[in-house]
Design a protein with these regions (language model features):
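Conserved class I S-adenosyl-L-methionine
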Residues: 1-44, 65, 165-166
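C-terminal alpha-helical "lid/dimerization" subdomain adjacent to the S-adenosyl-L-methionine
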Residues: 3-6, 62, 149-204
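Class I SAM-dependent methyltransferase SAM/SAH-binding core
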Residues: 53-55, 59-106
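A short SAM/SAH-binding and catalytic strip from SAM-dependent methyltransferases
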Residues: 116-129
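A short glycine-rich, Lys/Arg-flanked "PGG" loop and its adjoining helix->strand segment in the class I
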Residues: 132-144
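C-terminal lobe and adjacent flexible extensions of AdoMet/dcAdoMet transferase-like proteins
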Residues: 208-212
Length: 212
Protein backbone atom coordinates (compact mmCIF):
# COMPACT_ATOMS: atom_id res chain seq x y z
CA UNK A 1 0.00 0.00 0.00
CA UNK A 2 1.40 3.40 -1.00
CA UNK A 3 2.14 6.18 1.48
CA UNK A 4 -0.46 8.33 -0.31
CA UNK A 5 -3.18 5.73 0.10
CA UNK A 6 -2.22 5.17 3.74
CA UNK A 7 -2.37 8.94 4.25
CA UNK A 8 -5.82 9.11 2.67
CA UNK A 9 -7.02 6.30 4.91
CA UNK A 10 -5.79 8.18 7.98
CA UNK A 11 -7.59 11.29 6.74
CA UNK A 12 -10.90 9.43 6.33
CA UNK A 13 -10.44 7.63 9.65
CA UNK A 14 -10.16 11.05 11.31
CA UNK A 15 -12.91 12.57 9.16
CA UNK A 16 -15.29 9.78 10.19
CA UNK A 17 -15.75 11.48 13.58
CA UNK A 18 -17.39 14.54 12.00
CA UNK A 19 -18.55 13.05 8.68
CA UNK A 20 -22.24 12.76 9.55
CA UNK A 21 -22.24 16.33 10.90
CA UNK A 22 -20.58 17.58 7.70
CA UNK A 23 -23.23 15.85 5.58
CA UNK A 24 -25.99 17.27 7.78
CA UNK A 25 -24.69 20.82 7.29
CA UNK A 26 -24.19 20.35 3.55
CA UNK A 27 -27.47 18.54 2.84
CA UNK A 28 -29.59 20.48 5.36
CA UNK A 29 -33.20 19.30 4.94
CA UNK A 30 -32.46 17.31 1.81
CA UNK A 31 -30.32 14.53 3.28
CA UNK A 32 -33.18 12.04 3.61
CA UNK A 33 -34.59 13.08 0.25
CA UNK A 34 -31.29 12.29 -1.45
CA UNK A 35 -31.07 8.82 0.08
CA UNK A 36 -34.69 8.04 -0.72
CA UNK A 37 -34.15 9.19 -4.29
CA UNK A 38 -31.23 6.79 -4.73
CA UNK A 39 -32.97 3.84 -3.07
CA UNK A 40 -36.21 4.43 -4.99
CA UNK A 41 -34.26 4.62 -8.26
CA UNK A 42 -33.02 1.07 -7.65
CA UNK A 43 -36.62 -0.16 -8.21
CA UNK A 44 -36.18 -3.36 -6.23
CA UNK A 45 -39.79 -3.72 -5.07
CA UNK A 46 -40.44 -6.79 -7.24
CA UNK A 47 -37.00 -8.35 -6.80
CA UNK A 48 -36.74 -11.29 -4.39
CA UNK A 49 -33.68 -11.24 -2.12
CA UNK A 50 -31.92 -8.46 -4.02
CA UNK A 51 -28.18 -8.06 -3.63
CA UNK A 52 -26.90 -4.51 -3.15
CA UNK A 53 -23.30 -3.30 -2.92
CA UNK A 54 -22.52 0.23 -1.73
CA UNK A 55 -19.01 1.32 -2.77
CA UNK A 56 -17.24 3.92 -0.59
CA UNK A 57 -20.10 3.50 1.86
CA UNK A 58 -18.64 5.84 4.48
CA UNK A 59 -20.67 5.72 7.68
CA UNK A 60 -23.30 3.57 5.98
CA UNK A 61 -26.27 5.90 5.52
CA UNK A 62 -27.16 4.69 2.02
CA UNK A 63 -26.73 0.95 2.49
CA UNK A 64 -28.59 1.12 5.81
CA UNK A 65 -31.46 2.78 3.94
CA UNK A 66 -31.58 -0.21 1.60
CA UNK A 67 -31.63 -2.54 4.61
CA UNK A 68 -34.47 -0.54 6.13
CA UNK A 69 -36.61 -0.52 2.99
CA UNK A 70 -36.07 -4.12 1.83
CA UNK A 71 -36.28 -6.75 4.56
CA UNK A 72 -34.83 -9.57 2.44
CA UNK A 73 -31.96 -7.63 0.89
CA UNK A 74 -28.35 -8.84 1.01
CA UNK A 75 -26.72 -5.49 1.74
CA UNK A 76 -22.95 -4.97 1.65
CA UNK A 77 -21.17 -1.73 2.53
CA UNK A 78 -17.62 -1.43 1.16
CA UNK A 79 -15.04 1.17 2.23
CA UNK A 80 -11.28 1.42 2.69
CA UNK A 81 -11.54 3.44 5.92
CA UNK A 82 -11.76 1.42 9.11
CA UNK A 83 -12.89 4.54 10.96
CA UNK A 84 -15.86 4.98 8.63
CA UNK A 85 -16.80 1.31 8.97
CA UNK A 86 -16.65 1.49 12.77
CA UNK A 87 -19.12 4.39 12.69
CA UNK A 88 -21.37 2.47 10.29
CA UNK A 89 -21.31 -0.63 12.49
CA UNK A 90 -22.48 1.40 15.48
CA UNK A 91 -25.69 2.55 13.77
CA UNK A 92 -29.19 1.14 14.02
CA UNK A 93 -29.87 -1.71 11.54
CA UNK A 94 -26.13 -2.34 11.11
CA UNK A 95 -26.81 -5.98 12.01
CA UNK A 96 -28.63 -6.26 8.66
CA UNK A 97 -25.61 -5.10 6.66
CA UNK A 98 -22.27 -6.75 5.98
CA UNK A 99 -19.50 -4.16 6.13
CA UNK A 100 -16.29 -4.98 4.26
CA UNK A 101 -12.99 -3.12 4.22
CA UNK A 102 -11.49 -2.92 0.74
CA UNK A 103 -10.33 -0.89 -2.24
CA UNK A 104 -12.96 0.37 -4.71
CA UNK A 105 -10.56 -0.16 -7.62
CA UNK A 106 -10.16 -3.87 -6.82
CA UNK A 107 -13.41 -5.37 -5.54
CA UNK A 108 -13.26 -8.73 -3.79
CA UNK A 109 -16.33 -10.19 -5.53
CA UNK A 110 -16.98 -12.38 -8.54
CA UNK A 111 -18.56 -11.31 -11.82
CA UNK A 112 -22.28 -10.55 -12.15
CA UNK A 113 -23.05 -10.72 -8.42
CA UNK A 114 -25.23 -7.72 -7.59
CA UNK A 115 -28.59 -6.35 -8.66
CA UNK A 116 -27.52 -2.87 -7.62
CA UNK A 117 -24.07 -1.36 -7.20
CA UNK A 118 -24.11 2.19 -5.89
CA UNK A 119 -21.65 4.88 -4.92
CA UNK A 120 -22.89 8.05 -3.25
CA UNK A 121 -20.96 11.34 -3.29
CA UNK A 122 -17.55 9.65 -3.29
CA UNK A 123 -16.44 8.82 -6.84
CA UNK A 124 -15.08 12.29 -7.53
CA UNK A 125 -12.69 11.90 -4.58
CA UNK A 126 -10.85 9.01 -6.23
CA UNK A 127 -7.80 9.68 -8.38
CA UNK A 128 -8.45 9.55 -12.12
CA UNK A 129 -6.86 6.12 -12.65
CA UNK A 130 -8.46 4.63 -9.53
CA UNK A 131 -11.81 6.16 -10.46
CA UNK A 132 -11.76 4.53 -13.88
CA UNK A 133 -10.74 1.18 -12.39
CA UNK A 134 -13.54 1.46 -9.84
CA UNK A 135 -16.11 2.05 -12.59
CA UNK A 136 -14.89 -0.98 -14.52
CA UNK A 137 -15.07 -3.02 -11.31
CA UNK A 138 -18.65 -1.88 -10.71
CA UNK A 139 -19.53 -2.91 -14.24
CA UNK A 140 -17.88 -6.29 -13.67
CA UNK A 141 -19.72 -7.19 -10.47
CA UNK A 142 -23.21 -5.93 -11.40
CA UNK A 143 -25.59 -8.43 -12.99
CA UNK A 144 -26.37 -8.09 -16.72
CA UNK A 145 -29.87 -6.84 -15.87
CA UNK A 146 -28.69 -4.81 -12.86
CA UNK A 147 -27.87 -1.14 -12.46
CA UNK A 148 -24.95 0.94 -11.25
CA UNK A 149 -26.19 4.07 -9.47
CA UNK A 150 -23.73 6.92 -9.00
CA UNK A 151 -24.87 9.87 -6.89
CA UNK A 152 -22.69 12.97 -7.11
CA UNK A 153 -22.81 16.53 -5.85
CA UNK A 154 -23.97 19.48 -7.81
CA UNK A 155 -21.70 22.37 -6.85
CA UNK A 156 -23.27 23.97 -3.73
CA UNK A 157 -24.98 27.33 -4.20
CA UNK A 158 -24.56 28.74 -0.69
CA UNK A 159 -21.29 30.66 -0.46
CA UNK A 160 -20.08 29.15 2.83
CA UNK A 161 -20.90 25.56 1.87
CA UNK A 162 -19.46 26.12 -1.60
CA UNK A 163 -16.22 27.39 -0.05
CA UNK A 164 -16.02 24.38 2.31
CA UNK A 165 -16.77 22.06 -0.61
CA UNK A 166 -13.90 23.44 -2.69
CA UNK A 167 -11.52 23.52 0.29
CA UNK A 168 -12.17 19.84 0.97
CA UNK A 169 -11.76 19.06 -2.72
CA UNK A 170 -8.49 20.98 -2.77
CA UNK A 171 -7.17 19.16 0.31
CA UNK A 172 -8.15 15.58 -0.51
CA UNK A 173 -9.67 15.53 -3.96
CA UNK A 174 -7.41 14.65 -6.89
CA UNK A 175 -6.40 17.38 -9.32
CA UNK A 176 -8.95 16.27 -11.90
CA UNK A 177 -11.93 16.05 -9.54
CA UNK A 178 -13.44 19.40 -10.57
CA UNK A 179 -13.01 18.49 -14.21
CA UNK A 180 -14.66 15.13 -13.58
CA UNK A 181 -17.72 16.79 -12.05
CA UNK A 182 -17.96 19.21 -14.98
CA UNK A 183 -17.95 16.39 -17.57
CA UNK A 184 -21.31 15.08 -16.43
CA UNK A 185 -22.09 11.64 -17.86
CA UNK A 186 -19.27 11.49 -20.43
CA UNK A 187 -16.86 9.43 -18.24
CA UNK A 188 -19.66 6.91 -17.64
CA UNK A 189 -20.60 6.66 -21.32
CA UNK A 190 -17.02 5.61 -22.03
CA UNK A 191 -17.55 2.47 -19.91
CA UNK A 192 -21.27 1.62 -19.86
CA UNK A 193 -23.56 1.02 -22.85
CA UNK A 194 -26.60 2.77 -21.39
CA UNK A 195 -26.31 5.89 -19.22
CA UNK A 196 -29.06 8.24 -18.08
CA UNK A 197 -29.03 11.25 -15.78
CA UNK A 198 -31.58 12.52 -13.28
CA UNK A 199 -31.56 15.08 -10.47
CA UNK A 200 -32.97 15.26 -6.97
CA UNK A 201 -35.82 17.70 -6.46
CA UNK A 202 -33.59 19.92 -4.33
CA UNK A 203 -31.03 20.19 -7.14
CA UNK A 204 -28.19 19.42 -4.71
CA UNK A 205 -27.32 16.05 -6.24
CA UNK A 206 -27.43 14.24 -9.56
CA UNK A 207 -27.88 10.51 -10.13
CA UNK A 208 -26.13 8.73 -12.98
CA UNK A 209 -27.88 5.45 -13.84
CA UNK A 210 -25.64 3.00 -15.70
CA UNK A 211 -26.34 -0.36 -17.32
CA UNK A 212 -23.86 -2.83 -18.80
Amino acid sequence: MTKLRTGRQKYYDAFSHIYDLFIKVHAHNYKDETRRFLVDSARLEDKRQPKVLDICCGTGSVILSFAEQFSDVLAIGYDFSLGMLHKANAKELSDKVIFVMGDASSLSFGNDCFDIVCCSHALYELKGQDRKKALFEMKRVVKPDGKVLIMEHEVPRKKLIKMLFYIRMLIMGPKDSREFLKKGIIPFQEIFTNVTLSHTRSGKSKLVICRK
